[in-house]
Every structure is written in structure tokens, then in C-alpha cells.
């Protein structure tokens, strides 16, 4: 299983909606493509790269992809793993 590690750069003021943080959406993508996936804080739209340091490598399929999330402030992030069908998401924070 390949692992992508994402580390929150700063604590968001409002809740950060992270529906894109799923093995399904990371699978088969490069780190640059993962960093370009959308997230939002309130009414403002961002990319994952705006909020997270991203390293590692995604698997070819969701089943082969694990995501480790780190950083203070992860309690202010919502929807990690929302609607995922396979793989693994571990939130440490």
C-alpha cells in the first residue's frame, strides 16, 4: 500500500472542508495533482496545497492508497475520507 502524508500548515479560522482527502480522489495522481484538489474554508475556495504539505505517493487504485493526516488543528478540518470506497485514512492530531 502506498502512503500519502499530508501535514496541516496552519490552523484554519473556520472549519476547513476537505472532501477531496480520500483514497478514491488521490489514487493514480501525482503530488502536484493532489495539491491542486479543492477544499474550502467558509465561502472561500482553496486547494489542498494551500493548506497542507503533501509528500509520499498515491497508489494506482484507492485500495492501494493510504492517507496519513498530521498537524495541530486537524480538529478544525471536516470530511476526511467522506464517501471513500476503499483504502485507508488515518488522522493524527
Feature locations, PLM:
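Charge-rich, low-hydrophobicity low-complexity segments
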Residues: 1-93
Amino acid at each position: 500500500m502506498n502512503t500519502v502524508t499530508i501535514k496541516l500548515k496552519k490552523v484554519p479560522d473556520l472549519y476547513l472542508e476537505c472532501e477531496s482527502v480520500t483514497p478514491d480522489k488521490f489514487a493514480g495522481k501525482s503530488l502536484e495533482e493532489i495539491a491542486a484538489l479543492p477544499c474550502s474554508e467558509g465561502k472561500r475556495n482553496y486547494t489542498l496545497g494551500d493548506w497542507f504539505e503533501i509528500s509520499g505517493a498515491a497508489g494506482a487504485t484507492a485500495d492501494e492508497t493510504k492517507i496519513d493526516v498530521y498537524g495541530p488543528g486537524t480538529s478544525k478540518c471536516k470530511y476526511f475520507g467522506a464517501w471513500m470506497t476503499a483504502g485507508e485514512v488515518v488522522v493524527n492530531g
